Amino acid sequence: MHDDRLRRHEAATAPEDLGRMFVERANAGDVAGLVALYEADAVLALPTGQATGTQQIRQAYEHLLADKPTFTPGEQQPALVNGDLALTSTRLTDGAVTVEVARRQPDGTWLWAVDQPNILG
């Protein structure tokens, strides 16, 4: 699950950190940094289906960031934590809501295992 990708990026010490890190890295055009927020076999929902695993998630973010969009932080909700799993959610400024499942890694950091970036909006 966890690998050396996080050594060159800040690691999430709380599940809520992942949303902030996403906005920072997306606005910086840091595709590798975005991919580092996910477990190696994570699932990312897309308008056309889903991306599974590091390579497909990387391709999805390369496509998304090609036009250099700007991301605005939303209202991060407190994580709902049960053991090594956490449900995270953010209400975006356009009214859309994101929902993610994060998993605590063996070193205590958190990575997304499932990401549904837009369920309303």
State where each predicted segment sits.
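Short beta-strand edge/turn micro-motifs at domain boundaries
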Residues: 97-121
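Short, surface-exposed coil-to-beta transition loops
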Residues: 72-74, 94-99
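Acidic surface patches and DE-rich sequence motifs
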Residues: 46, 92, 105
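A solvent-exposed, acidic/Ser-Thr-rich amphipathic alpha-helical stretch
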Residues: 13, 31-82
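Residue-level signal for tight coil/turn positions that link beta-strands
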Residues: 82-85, 107
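Short beta-strand segments that buttress and anchor functional surface loops
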Residues: 86-93
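Short, low-complexity N-terminal intrinsically disordered segments enriched in polar/charged residues
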Residues: 1-40
